[in-house]
């Protein structure tokens, strides 16, 4: 069974979503199915079909969450240190083309959200950063072309 790296915060978020889906969403959907059944003929009952579809999605997501949680390799980023970039690092970069500064934390696939600065360990930019140090310059091939970034700061917070 392949381990899935994730931060402590990411692990807690997955556990909370699992709890919500099992304890709140599942009973709500069961109630919706029951109500829709009470309306009679199921073959043309849109409410029933929508509730069954929601149930299928919810149960699939529960199975997925249980799998990720079972395979989680939880890494407490606050206990990490070092000069090289590894999983969990928060990295400040300077785009050498635009002079724009960006801050990213390298996280597990399930917790990645680029809008809040969390990039997946398997993303092209994270793969280019792993093992590098402050002052190094990396080249990232993105859909819009290649970009050069200078690593300004590495933190484990």
UniProtKB/Swiss-Prot annotation:
Gene3D superfamilies with a match to the protein in the record: Transcription elongation factor, GreA/GreB, C-terminal domain, Transcription elongation factor, GreA/GreB, N-terminal domain
Keywords: DNA-binding, Transcription, Transcription regulation
Record GO biological process: DNA-templated transcription elongation; regulation of DNA-templated transcription elongation
GO molecular function term, any single one: RNA polymerase binding
HAMAP family on file: GreA_GreB
Family statement: Belongs to the GreA/GreB family.
Function noted in UniProt: Necessary for efficient RNA polymerase transcription elongation past template-encoded arresting sites. The arresting sites in DNA have the property of trapping a certain fraction of elongating RNA polymerases that pass through, resulting in locked ternary complexes. Cleavage of the nascent transcript by cleavage factors such as GreA or GreB allows the resumption of elongation from the new 3'terminus. GreA releases sequences of 2 to 3 nucleotides.
Protein name per the record: Transcription elongation factor GreA
Classification of source organism: Bacteria, Pseudomonadati, Pseudomonadota, Alphaproteobacteria, Hyphomicrobiales
């Amino acid at each position: 069974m392949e381990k899935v790296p994730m931060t402590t915060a990411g692990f807690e978020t997955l556990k909370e979503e699992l709890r919500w889906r099992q304890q709140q969403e599942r009973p709500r959907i069961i109630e919706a199915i029951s109500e829709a059944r009470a309306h009679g003929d199921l073959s043309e009952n849109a409410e029933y079909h929508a509730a069954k579809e929601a149930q299928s999605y919810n149960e699939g997501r529960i199975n997925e969450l249980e799998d990720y949680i079972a395979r989680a390799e939880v890494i407490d980023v606050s206990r990490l240190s070092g000069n090289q970039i590894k999983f969990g690092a928060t990295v400040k970069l300077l785009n050498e083309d635009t002079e724009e500064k960006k801050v990213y934390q390298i996280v597990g696939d399930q917790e990645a959200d680029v809008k809040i600065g969390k990039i997946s360990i398997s993303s092209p930019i994270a793969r280019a950063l792993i093992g590098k140090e402050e002052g190094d310059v990396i080249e990232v091939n993105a859909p819009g072309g290649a970009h050069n970034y200078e690593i300004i700061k590495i933190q484990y917070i």
